[in-house]
Curated annotation (Swiss-Prot):
Assembly with partners or alone: Interacts (via N-terminus) with RIT2; the interaction controls POU4F1 transactivation activity on some neuronal target genes. Isoform 1 interacts with POU4F2 isoform 2; this interaction inhibits both POU4F1 DNA-binding and transcriptional activities. Isoform 1 interacts (C-terminus) with ESR1 (via DNA-binding domain); this interaction decreases the estrogen receptor ESR1 transcriptional activity in a DNA- and ligand 17-beta-estradiol-independent manner.
Annotated domain remarks: The C-terminal domain is able to act as both DNA-binding domain and a transcriptional activator. The N-terminal domain is also required for transactivation activity on some target genes acting as a discrete activation domain. Neurite outgrowth and expression of genes required for synapse formation are primarily dependent on the C-terminal domain, however the N-terminal domain is required for maximal induction.
Start-end of Basic residues biased regions: 99-108
Name of the protein in its database record: POU domain, class 4, transcription factor 1
UniProt-reported outcome of changing V378I: Abolishes transcriptional activity. Increases transcriptional repression. Disrupts induction of neurite outgrowth and expression of synaptic genes. No effect on transactivation of BCL2 expression
Source organism superkingdom: Eukaryota
GO CC, any one term: neuron projection
Ranges of the DNA-binding region feature: 357-416
Length: 421
C-alpha cells in the first residue's frame, strides 16, 4: 500500500485535484467528487481512465489506513467512501439479480487492507464492472475500464461509477448511472438505508430471481399444476376410452357369437358341411368306421369313439338337428387333422413310402443261425405252429423264421442240382 501511495504523485493527471496524501474521511467524498468531474476535452493522455482508476484506488487505500489508525472512533463504510450522500438515485435498467441482497441497518466494522482488496476483487463487483463497461450509450469508456465500469467523458467512471463499494453514483453530464443505455447495476453488494432507492429492481423477473415476495404465482408451481391437471384429464380420458373399448368389444363379441350360432344352426350350412365332409373323407381313403374310431384319438373332453352308423347318419342328414350341431365341430377338427397329415405325407414321400418299398435286410446272429440249421436238418418243412414255436424260442419274428426256412430249402435245391449236373 505504501508503494502505491508513494507512486501517487506521479499519476495525478487532473490539475484540479489537490495533492492529498492521507485525506480524511470527510474530505475523501469531496476529493472523489472532484475526481468524477469530466476530463478536459484537450487532454492528450490516452490512459486517462487508467490513471483515474489508480488514483481512486490509492485514495481508497489511504482512507483505509486512516480508518485503521483511528480505531473504532471512525468506523469505515465502503458505501460512504465511494458514494456521496446527496447523489441522485439512478433507476437501473439492468435485470441481472444481485448475488447478495441483504438489508442490514448496522454499520460495517473497519476493514483491513487485505479485506478491502478481496472486497474489490469479489465476483459481484466483477459482474458490476462488466455491466458498467456495457453502458456505452452514456458516452463510451476508455481502453482500460476500471472496476467501476466505463471511464470516459460520458460514462460513469472511477469510484463513482459502480466501484468496489457498489453501483450508483453518476459520473459526468452524460453519466447518470451508466448513461441512458444503463450498464450499471442499481444496487451494491451491501446496500445501506440511504441507498434504499437504488437497491431495488422493479422488473418482475429480477424480483423473482432475488427470491423477493411477489404477487405472481411461481412458474414451476403453475407448470406442475397444469401437468397434474393434464395427467388427471388424460387418465380420465383413458379410463373412458377403456370403458368404451370394453363395451364395444362386448357388443362385437356378442354379435360374433350370434353370427356363429346362426351359421352353426343354419340347416343349409349343416347340409353343405355334411356333403363336403363325405367327399373329403372318400378322397382321403378313410372309411366311416375309421372315422368313428379315430375320433377318440383327438382327446376332446367328453368325446369318445363313435360307431360307423352314427357317421353314416350324419352324412345322410338323418340325425336330429341338435346332434348334427354337436357333431359338426368334432368332425371338422378330425378332418383338418387328417388333411394336415396327408399334406405332410405328400410333401415328404420318402419318409412314408420309402420304408414300405425297400425293407431293411434282416441279419440273424450265429447262435440263432445254428439253432435254425439244426431244426432244418430235423424238419425242412415245419408247420405254421412249429414255426411260431421256434420263433418264440429264439426271440425272432415268425415271418423271419418262415422266410429263413424257405430260403434254406431253395439253397439245398440249388446245391443238389449243381451236384447232379
Amino acid at each position: 500500500m505504501m508503494s502505491m501511495n508513494s507512486k501517487q504523485p506521479h499519476f495525478a493527471m487532473h490539475p484540479t485535484l489537490p495533492e492529498h496524501k492521507y485525506p480524511s474521511l470527510h474530505s475523501s467524498s469531496e476529493a472523489i467528487r472532484r475526481a468524477c468531474l469530466p476530463t478536459p476535452p484537450l487532454q492528450s493522455n490516452l490512459f486517462a481512465s487508467l490513471d483515474e482508476t489508480l488514483l481512486a484506488r490509492a485514495e481508497a487505500l489511504a482512507a483505509v489506513d486512516i480508518a485503521v489508525s483511528q480505531g473504532k472512533s471512525h468506523p469505515f463504510k465502503p458505501d460512504a467512501t465511494y458514494h456521496t450522500m446527496n447523489s441522485v438515485p439512478c433507476t437501473s435498467t439492468s435485470t441481472v439479480p444481485l448475488a447478495h441482497h441483504h438489508h442490514h441497518h448496522h454499520h460495517h466494522q473497519a476493514l483491513e487492507p487485505g479485506d478491502l482488496l478481496d472486497h474489490i476483487s469479489s465476483p459481484s463487483l466483477a459482474l458490476m464492472a462488466g455491466a458498467g463497461g456495457a453502458g456505452a450509450a452514456g458516452g463510451g469508456g476508455g481502453a482500460h475500464d476500471g472496476p467501476g465500469g466505463g471511464g470516459g467523458p460520458g460514462g460513469g467512471g472511477g469510484p463513482g461509477g459502480g466501484g468496489p463499494g457498489g453501483g450508483g453514483g453518476g459520473g459526468g453530464p452524460g453519466g447518470g448511472g451508466g448513461g441512458p443505455g444503463g450498464g450499471l447495476l442499481g444496487g451494491s453488494a451491501h446496500p445501506h438505508p440511504h441507498m434504499h432507492g437504488l437497491g431495488h429492481l422493479s422488473h418482475p423477473a429480477a424480483a423473482a430471481a432475488m427470491n423477493m415476495p411477489s404477487g405472481l404465482p411461481h412458474p414451476g408451481l403453475v407448470a406442475a399444476a397444469a401437468h397434474h391437471g393434464a395427467a388427471a384429464a388424460a387418465a380420465a380420458a383413458a379410463a373412458g376410452q377403456v370403458a368404451a373399448a370394453s363395451a364395444a368389444a362386448a357388443v362385437v363379441g356378442a354379435a360374433g357369437l350370434a353370427s356363429i350360432c346362426d351359421s352353426d344352426t343354419d340347416p343349409r350350412e349343416l347340409e353343405a358341411f355334411a356333403e363336403r365332409f363325405k367327399q373329403r373323407r372318400i378322397k382321403l381313403g378313410v372309411t366311416q368306421a375309421d372315422v368313428g374310431s379315430a375320433l377318440a384319438n383327438l382327446k376332446i373332453p367328453g368325446v369318445g369313439s363313435l360307431s360307423q352308423s352314427t357317421i353314416c347318419r350324419f352324412e345322410s342328414l338323418t340325425l336330429s338337428h341338435n346332434n348334427m350341431i354337436a357333431l359338426k365341430p368334432i368332425l371338422q377338427a378330425w378332418l383338418e387333422e387328417a388333411e394336415g397329415a396327408q399334406r405332410e405325407k405328400m410333401n415328404k414321400p420318402e419318409l412314408f413310402n420309402g420304408g414300405e418299398k425297400k425293407r431293411k435286410r434282416t441279419s440273424i446272429a450265429a447262435p440263432e443261425k445254428r439253432s435254425l440249421e439244426a431244426y432244418f436238418a430235423v424238419q425242412p418243412r415245419p408247420s405254421s405252429e412249429k414255426i411260431a414255436a421256434i420263433a418264440e424260442k429264439l426271440d425272432l419274428k415268425k415271418n423271419v423264421v418262415r422266410v429263413w426256412f424257405c430260403n434254406q430249402r431253395q439253397k439245398q435245391k440249388r446245391m443238389k442240382f449243381s451236384a447232379t449236373y
